[in-house]
Every structure is written in structure tokens, then in C-alpha cells.
From Swiss-Prot:
Keyword Coiled coil: no
EC number: 3.1.-.-
Protein name from the UniProt record: Ribonuclease VapC10
Entry's family note: Belongs to the PINc/VapC protein family.
Organism whose genome encodes this protein: Mycobacterium tuberculosis (strain ATCC 25618 / H37Rv)
SS bond list: none
Cofactor(s) listed in the protein's UniProt record: Mg(2+)
Membrane-spanning ranges: none
One Pfam family of this chain: PIN
Length: 133
């Protein structure tokens, strides 16, 4: 199963055709998942006019909880990478730990936020997108 990061969902909501096409294609291989962190990020960042579309999108994913095991793994990752990658937030560590503990493939546009996955590549290209550091 693929764990989809918030930035992929945001690209879809902003009408990026490559994001929509990738989501449609990825669903052919089975259900997709998101972290509870992505749920909070999307709800927290949505505009009032987007409410219905955001809720519909979120309902189409399996939501992975942040368990104690995931929290401990996120803490381990944070200790390892906090000096070399000091702009990675707790949310991204929790998403990374969810993927690691649940043995899920991670799909993100911000690969720099996930140095713990050395072979990670963005699932699609977004013209003009520059990952945030």
C-alpha cells in the first residue's frame, strides 16, 4: 500500500493534472493510505470553499493512526536527522515513521524532508514546484 503525503493531495486539490493522473493510476494497484498527520494538515489548511472537496478526498483514503510504536520510531528518526535536516517538522517524522513501521511505500513531492528513505523519488513532476527545505 502507498502512504500519500499531504503535498500530493494539495497538488491534486490545486488542479495539478499530474497529481490527479497519478492518484487514479496508483489506486488501480489497491487502496491508498494517508497519515492522521495529513488529515490534520489538509483540514487545517483548507479554505471554506474547499471543505466539501477536501472531506470527499480524505474519505477516499485509509487513515493510518499514529500509535505509540510510530511515535517512538519518529523520535528515533528525529534524533538521527535533527542536526543535518533541522527544518524537518514533527509531522514529517510521524509520516515517515508510519511508512516505516507499517511497511508502506511513501509518495511525496518533498523528498528532502525524508532522508531516511534514500531511494525516494517524487511520484510525478509538477512544473515550477520547488520542494520546501
Amino acid at each position: 500500500m502507498i502512504l500519500v503525503d499531504s503535498d500530493v493531495l494539495i497538488a491534486h486539490l490545486r488542479g495539478v493534472v499530474a497529481a490527479r493522473d497519478w492518484l487514479v493510476s496508483a489506486r488501480k494497484d489497491g487502496p491508498l493510505a494517508i497519515s492522521v498527520v495529513s488529515t490534520a494538515e489538509l483540514i487545517g489548511g483548507m479554505r471554506t470553499a474547499e471543505r466539501r472537496e477536501v472531506w470527499r478526498l480524505l474519505a477516499s483514503f485509509r487513515v493510518q493512526p499514529a500509535t505509540e510504536v510510530i511515535a517512538r520510531r519518529a523520535g528515533d528518526m528525529m534524533r538521527r536527522y535533527r542536526r543535518s535536516h533541522n527544518r524537518i517538522g514533527l509531522g514529517d517524522y510521524l509520516i515517515a515513521a508510519t511508512a516505516d513501521v507499517q511497511d508502506l511505500q511513501l509518495a511525496t513531492l518533498n523528498v528532502w524532508h525524508f532522508p531516511m528513505f534514500e531511494q525516494l523519488k517524487p511520484p510525478f513532476a509538477v512544473p515550477g514546484h520547488r520542494p520546501r527545505a
